[in-house]
Each structure stands twice: as structure tokens, then as C-alpha cells.
Amino acid sequence: VESSDKAYEEDQEMTGFGLAPIKPQGQSIVYDTAQQGLTSRYTHIAYALGFIITHEALKDNLYEKIGMQRTGSLAFSMRQTKENVVANLYNRAFNGSYNGADGTTMISTAHPTLVGNQSNRLAVDADLSEASLEDICIQIAQAQNARGMKIAIMPKSLHIPVNLMFEATRILKSINQNDTANNAINAIRSMGLFPDGAKVNHYFTDPDAWFVRTNAPEGVKLFQREEATFEQDGDFDTSNLKYKAYERYSTG
């Protein structure tokens, strides 16, 4: 989460440099150029909701009971909204109607770079299992930057819907291999490949989809333009009391 003081934020990708070549004695240094890559824009969106307590309810001494209850419900609705907005990044991660700056979905086998397409998705989609987790861990460890250099990232946490919370626990925490008669260790657990464990997200809509967060320095972001505020005011024409909540942020 990062704060923002503008109408939108932008991330400008820079490719960095390639490997350093051998410098022969007396020869000039070879100079490389960091190239400008893709630009990602995060346009802040306002979310607001309110409710009204009638003049009659106020006069009948129902303010304290109704007001406190509905104010709590309003705060809950604002929190739920943000949870759903962020979760939708993952719910739409395979949906071609929601492509990113590189023209592909968030999870794709064909993210374009200077050295060719790169993938953050298994070549063949697979349900959550010990084998599929091992495959994605290998793929993560082989990740390259835009100049084709290994970046040595590793998995940190597994993010799952509620439907997979028991299966994920068995896979990550079993001492031996899960669902097999083999007397072999659970390599994922023994190697400590998911130090932050499994995180259950109640807002994921696909019961089979699972995601791995790595220790890469850049990833999914939330820019907070305006924190949630709660205000109340009276309406002159009706003598009703109005309550409202407002918040502005962006994700991507």
C-alpha cells in the first residue's frame, strides 16, 4: 500500500543493464543503455455510500440505537468494498477483458519482454497439489528480468479461496509427501519454500484458482489517494440526518 497525492500514479518500467563483458587491457569500457519499458497507470476511483435517519426517528429517541448500528454497517460496507476491489485483481487474472499494460492478463504464459515472452503461469493449468506447487516453484526460481538475467526470486506465500484451505494445509505442513504411500519427505516443507504459509482469501470467486506471491520487489499495488472519511449533516427540507462515507484509491 502506497499513499498518493495526485489524480493517478504511474509506474515506468526500466529494463536495467545486461551482463558486464570482459574488458581487454587498454580497451574502452562498453557502455549499455537502460531502455524504457511499459508504463502502468493507476487511476484513482472514488467509492462512497450513505444512509439517512428520518426526523421522526431522531425525535423518537431512536438515534443512538439506529445511528450506531448503521454507522458500523457503513464502515463494514466500505471495508468489504476494498476487499472485493483488490480481490478482483485475482478474480480477473485470467480474463482477457482485463489486460494490463503489456496487453496480456495478469497471469499469462506470454508476457512480452525484450528477450521474448515470459510466463507467470503453468504451461498446463493444474489444480492445487504437491506436484503443481513444485512445478510453479521451479518456474519462479527460473524467472528472468527484461534483459534475460536470472533474478533469483522465491515463493513467499500461497493464496487460496476457502475451498482449498484444508488441501493447502495438508500440502504445506505434512512432514511426508501428501496423499501418497511413499515414505519420502515433503520437500516443500523441508526447504521452507513458503515461509509466510497459506493465506485464505474469502473474496476469491474461483474455487479452484490459487496464486503464489514471491519476494520480487515489485508486484500488486494499492495507492491510497484519500482515506475513508465519515461525515454527517442535516437536510434542511426534510429535517432528516444524512450520513456518508467516502474513500478514493486505485489498484493494479
Where are these regions (language model features)?
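Short alpha-helical interface patches
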Residues: 27-32, 53-62, 162-166
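Alpha-helical scaffold segments that mediate packing/assembly in large oligomeric complexes
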Residues: 64-66, 76-139
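Polar low-complexity intrinsically disordered regions enriched in Ser/Thr and small residues
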Residues: 5-7, 19-23, 29, 99, ...
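Assembly/oligomerization interface modules of large self-assembling protein complexes
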Residues: 1-47
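Surface-exposed acidic, glycine-flexible loop patches that form ligand/cofactor-binding
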Residues: 95, 99, 146-151
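Long, contiguous amphipathic alpha-helices that act as assembly "spine/axial" helices in icosahedral shell
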Residues: 39-97, 158, 243-245
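Flexible, active-site-adjacent loop/turn segments at secondary-structure boundaries
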Residues: 40, 45, 56, 104, ...
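Sequence/fold signature of self-assembling virion shell proteins
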Residues: 107-145, 152-157, 163-252
